[in-house]
Each structure stands twice: as C-alpha cells, then as structure tokens.
UniProtKB/Swiss-Prot annotation:
GO terms for biological process: mitochondrial fission; positive regulation of mitochondrial fission; protein targeting to mitochondrion. InterPro entries: Mff-like_dom, Mff/Tango-11. Its main location: mitochondrion. It is a single-pass type IV membrane protein. GO terms for molecular function: protein homodimerization activity. This is Mitochondrial fission factor homolog A. It comes from Xenopus laevis. It is found in: Mitochondrion outer membrane; Peroxisome; Cytoplasmic vesicle, Secretory vesicle, Synaptic vesicle.
Length: 219
C-alpha cells in the first residue's frame, strides 16, 4: 500500500511540475538590482505553453562586466591536477561480517555519547533483523523447493501409474476381443450346421409327401 501511495505521489508531482514549470530566459548566480529585475519580470509576458531554453547562463565572476567576484570553488576546480586523481576498483565481494558498515570505523575516533550508543544499537538491531529475515527467506525457499520436488515426484508417480493402468486396460480389452472373435466363429459354425440340418429335413419331408401323393393316386 505504501509503495502504491509513493508511486501515485510521484506521478502527481511529475504532472504538477510539467504543468507549472517555466524556464526563465536568463539565470544568474547572485542577484543584481532586485527592483529592476522584479519590474522586468512583471512586465515580461509569461509563456503559457511554449518552453524556451535561455540563450546564456552567466556565472558570477566569469564576465568582465559582472560586478561580482569569481567564486573560489571554480579556482580550486580549475587548479586541480587531473593526473593526481585516481579511481579505486571496488572489491568483488562485500562481506558484512568482516566490514559491516563504513561508519563503524569511526567508533574508535569519536567519543561515546548516548546518541552514538543509540545509533549503534539501532544499527545492530537492523543487522540482526536483516540476518533473521534472510534466514527466514532462505528457509522458506528451501521448504518451497522441497514441496516442489515432492509435487514433481508425485506427478511422476501418478503418470507412471496412469501408464500402467492404460497398459493393463489395453491387455484386458485385447483378451476380451479375442474371446468375442472365438464366440462369433462358433456361432457361425453352429448356424451353418443348423441350416444344413434344416435343408436335409425339408428335403426328406418333401420327398415323403410326394411319395404318399403318388401312392394315393395309384389306388
């Protein structure tokens, strides 16, 4: 919820800056004649939509016409030899147990005060809380990994069981089909035998009837 509020605040802040920001035509470090500048600013029309970039930026002491002296910071920056500056490569691994925080090196130089003791205790509490959160997070990840492994093993077992059941069902269906085929063959053979028997009986009955009719006519 706090993250959502912060994002909404940043969006509102950015929108307000974009709508209300106006870029001046000229910037100066030290103010000159305040009355003249205010009067000029009041007479100057403020652009409504178009934002214009100033033509120049004047630093105090840089121009000969400026009544202000050159700042000493610029002299220090210009007089510094770039060759004396060097960049130190940071270490690849940062271990909190060996060097917890940089401000702990100053404990021996600064005298112990109640505020420093309170800050130190709060730092220890934060480190303990951070380490406990890391331990809980690692334990949660291990438990999640174990549960996922158990679920994958169970899925594999269920798949194997389903395959075995499918093979058993296929074998039983094959046996039943073979039995049905044999039964059909037996029924067809019995039907053929019955047809032959009926034809023989019908032939005998017809011959006997014709013979009786001929004998009766002879009388």
């Amino acid at each position: 919820m706090a993250e959502i509020n912060r994002m909404q605040y940043e969006i509102d802040y950015t929108e307000g800056i974009s709508q209300r920001m106006r870029v001046p035509e000229m910037l100066k470090v030290a103010p000159g004649n305040l009355g003249a500048n205010l009067k000029a600013q009041q007479d100057m029309p403020i652009p409504g939509v178009v934002m214009e970039v100033p033509e120049r930026i004047v630093v105090a002491g840089q121009s000969e016409e400026s009544p202000f002296s050159r700042p000493s910071d610029l002299d220090f920056i210009s007089g510094t030899n770039i060759g004396t500056l060097a960049l130190k490569t940071p270490p690849r691994v940062l271990t909190l147990s060996e060097r917890p925080l940089d401000f702990l090196d100053l404990e021996g130089l600064t005298p112990a005060t109640p505020q420093s003791e309170e800050i130190r205790s709060s730092g220890h509490l934060k480190r303990d809380k951070f380490s406990s959160e890391n331990a809980l997070r690692q334990n949660g990840q291990l438990v999640r990994h174990d549960s996922m492994s158990a679920m994958s093993t169970l899925d594999t077992t269920l798949d194997a069981t389903a395959d075995d059941l499918a093979l058993a069902d296929a074998a039983s269906l094959r046996r039943q089909i073979i039995k049905l085929n044999r039964r059909l063959l037996l029924l067809e053979e019995e039907n053929k035998e019955r047809v032959k028997h009926e034809m023989t009986m019908y032939s005998i009955i017809i011959i006997f009837g014709l013979l009786n009719s001929w004998l009766w006519l002879r009388r």
